[in-house]
Amino acid sequence: MMNWKKTALAGMIAVTAAILIAGCGSQSQKQDSQKMPDKIVIGLDDNFPPMGFRDESGKLIGFDIDLANEAAKRMGVKVEFKPIDWDSKEAALKSKKVDMLWNGLTITDSRKKQIAFSKPYMKNAQILIVRADSSIQTKDDLKGKVIGTQEGSSSVDALDKDQGFKNSLQDVKLYGDFVAALMDLEVGRTDGVLVDSVVGRYYMTKKEGKFRVLAGSMGDEEFGVGMRQDDTVLVNKLNSVLKEMSADGTMKKLSEKWFKTDITIPVQ
């Protein structure tokens, strides 16, 4: 009987050891899979000035482009920018067509359920823009009117949160990008545009005297970088680099380059 107990005990010890070894191996493999990549692919809407857009020669430029290039340099990785359908951005990230969403991406509770966000780095707001010669003076004056906005944007989320205002409108036209929406506003196809402040105000500087902003906003926001929820090493590394660039004045310098003022958030 004693020999049987010894044999059973030895067997249990062997099985336990095997499980522990397998567990260590699994943990090691998990850690290996979480190593920093040699290259990151950034998904963006390449018609989203001044965050990411193309100049007259077709070169990709903008605040987020400059910021992402500097971040990649400090992380020691190569970077590729890949234009995507912004309305399907979460799918592009999940399917690994891209590794990051970095293009004036608003942090929202609904998006947090699908993707991991970096720490916020910039302030934004949702604003209503009308033509300068319009009789519309307030948000309430848009009752029975047509406004435009970008499909899949946080402007749509802001509109959905204000059902009273949305239901008062005659129609809401959705566009592939804000620039197209603002162009339609300029020629009179719509009466107003709900747009990210950073985009709308930048566009207005290129069209002086054409537009004006209605008083107030439809919500304050913060921008962050979107990543896959299981890419914890990448998330942590980027947060560290963003904090560094915030502390050393790099973000402030880039913001002043593109916005003439510092609208970044101190990254903690």
Model-derived regions: residue spans:
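Short, low-complexity disordered leader/linker segments with a strong preference
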Residues: 1-39, 263-268
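Ligand-binding clefts/hinges and TM-proximal coupling segments of bilobed small-molecule sensing domains
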Residues: 26-30, 154-173, 212-214, 243-268
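Extracytoplasmic small-molecule ligand-binding "clamshell" domains
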Residues: 32-104, 248
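Periplasmic-binding protein-like
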Residues: 46, 123-130, 197, 201-243, ...
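Ligand-binding cleft/hinge of the Venus flytrap
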Residues: 54, 68-77, 155-175, 204-208
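Extended ligand-binding regions for polar small-molecule ligands
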Residues: 65-74, 140, 145-146, 151-154, ...
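Acidic, polar ligand-binding/catalytic clefts
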Residues: 69, 78-141
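A ligand-binding cleft/hinge motif common to bilobed small-molecule-binding domains
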Residues: 105-113, 160-161, 184-187, 191-220
